[in-house]
């Protein structure tokens, strides 16, 4: 089936948005900036009010989150990216806590309405199909449920396969804009990150299926895998770090039980090299987040190794990955989806990896989490914990055993105080730690975060 595509302007397309509507924006590099700008122009002209904006992580400007649009646009994001972090922490914008796997369900079950989906797609092929490119995630569900779908057709959007392909008959308005996609570039891992990468790599077996995100620690892990064999990818996102391993044949997906020989992801962010890699590449499946992040689907592959990071971990194994004390820094994301999926996988390993200290010299391992900190991965879910000082297996360990193990990979300068807190709490661990916290909150200045997070970046 083919469809005659008629283009219009961004200004004309966004006229379908009404006051009170809920608008979805496609994610990461696929945020449709020309439509966003046209929507905001209507807001400035006083034509809109109480429009709710929903999205996952997006790159680029987020003008709708400017406080001048109070009463016009309300951001209710599914993830807090750097471009909306300050307004979310200030309380001007809001956040919907949700497992990444369930973001698509919010639209499909009607918990969050979707009146208008604003997306970015590839150039149509001869059959009238376009690709969602770098952002399938919850965007596919938004397209399926929206009253109106507005699409920016961009020749730079890669033609990705899997569930990324949609027919142009599903789209109501087309706008042409060939602005190059946003790119992400990462610095080389430092000494600490390299040490973490080596410890994680030692836990990865030949034939493992990997999940990891983007950034310094995932890149440090990937850099250590050149001697491995028959690795696979089933993840929520990937970036440049996987490409050398694909080119060398280390990543080939041959040991996977499902999607054999395929790399599976739901969104991605990287350099132009990554976008070129997935373009017209049948070895990459860009899938709905309800598939990629379903723990049951994840567990179907053997030796799933999920590597995720944290902002703070307490000595019982509670993992905070979304907030700095009471201030949201990112979001729940897909961490627990993959931690649980890996734990159900035959031979799987769920790994939490982080530097032992912040960049301000404060221990990220604490007797208890900072007040207000969110628990993303519970102490019941955590298996392996890794810092630059080593890797410890917490599975099946008692509270006291895991406390000793976690302390053993803390920075040496923090271990004595952490162990003292453990000893004082031994008689009644959780109640004891609360008592320790109240007596030792002054120690925050000397390197442990007990009482509160004084500044929003203390845990970074």
Predicted regions mapped to residue ranges:
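Conserved alpha/beta enzyme-core scaffold
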Residues: 1-415
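Mature, solvent-exposed C-terminal subdomains and processed small-chain segments of exported/organellar
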Residues: 317, 413-460
């Amino acid at each position: 089936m083919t469809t005659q595509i008629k283009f219009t302007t961004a200004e004309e397309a966004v006229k379908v948005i009404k006051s009170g509507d809920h608008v979805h924006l496609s994610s990461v590099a696929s945020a449709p900036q020309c439509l966003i700008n046209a929507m905001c122009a209507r807001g400035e002209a006083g034509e809109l009010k109480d429009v709710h904006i929903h999205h996952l992580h997006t790159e680029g400007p987020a003008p709708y989150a400017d406080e001048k649009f109070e009463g016009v646009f309300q951001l209710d994001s599914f993830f807090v990216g750097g471009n909306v972090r300050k307004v979310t922490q200030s309380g001007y914008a809001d956040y919907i806590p949700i497992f990444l796997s369930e973001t698509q369900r919010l639209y499909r079950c009607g918990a969050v309405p979707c009146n208008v989906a604003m997306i970015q797609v590839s150039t149509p092929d001869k059959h009238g199909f376009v690709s969602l490119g770098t952002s399938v995630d919850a965007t596919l569900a938004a397209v399926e449920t929206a009253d109106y779908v507005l699409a920016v057709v961009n020749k730079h959007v890669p033609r990705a396969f899997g569930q990324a392909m949609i027919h142009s008959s599903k789209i109501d308005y087309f706008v042409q804009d060939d602005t190059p996609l946003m790119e992400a570039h990462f610095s080389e891992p430092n000494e600490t990150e390299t040490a973490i990468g080596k410890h994680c790599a030692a836990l990865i077996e030949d034939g493992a299926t990997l999940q990891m995100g983007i950034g310094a620690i995932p890149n440090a892990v990937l850099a250590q895998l050149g001697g491995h064999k028959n690795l696979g990818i089933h993840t929520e996102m990937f970036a440049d770090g996987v490409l050398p391993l694909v080119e060398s044949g280390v990543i080939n997906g041959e040991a996977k039980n499902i999607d054999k020989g395929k790399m599976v992801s739901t969104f991605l962010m990287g350099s132009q090299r990554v976008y070129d890699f997935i373009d017209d590449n049948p070895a990459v499946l860009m899938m709905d987040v309800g598939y990629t992040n379903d723990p049951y689907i994840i567990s179907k592959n053997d030796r799933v190794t999920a590597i995720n990071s944290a902002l703070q971990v307490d000595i019982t194994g509670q993992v905070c990955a979304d907030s700095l004390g009471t201030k949201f820094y990112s979001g729940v994301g897909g961490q627990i989806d993959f931690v649980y999926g890996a734990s159900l996988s035959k031979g799987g390993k769920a790994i939490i990896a982080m530097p032992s200290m912040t960049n301000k010299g404060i221990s990220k391992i604490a007797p208890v989490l900072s007040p207000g900190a969110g628990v993303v991965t519970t102490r019941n879910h955590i298996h392996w914990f890794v810092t630059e000082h080593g890797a410890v297996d917490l599975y099946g360990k008692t509270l006291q055993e895991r406390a000793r193990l976690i302390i053993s990979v803390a920075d040496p300068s923090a271990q004595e105080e952490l162990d003292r807190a453990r000893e004082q709490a031994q008689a009644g661990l959780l109640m004891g730690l609360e008592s320790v916290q109240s007596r030792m909150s002054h120690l925050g200045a000397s390197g442990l975060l007990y009482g509160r997070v004084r500044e929003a970046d203390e845990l970074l």
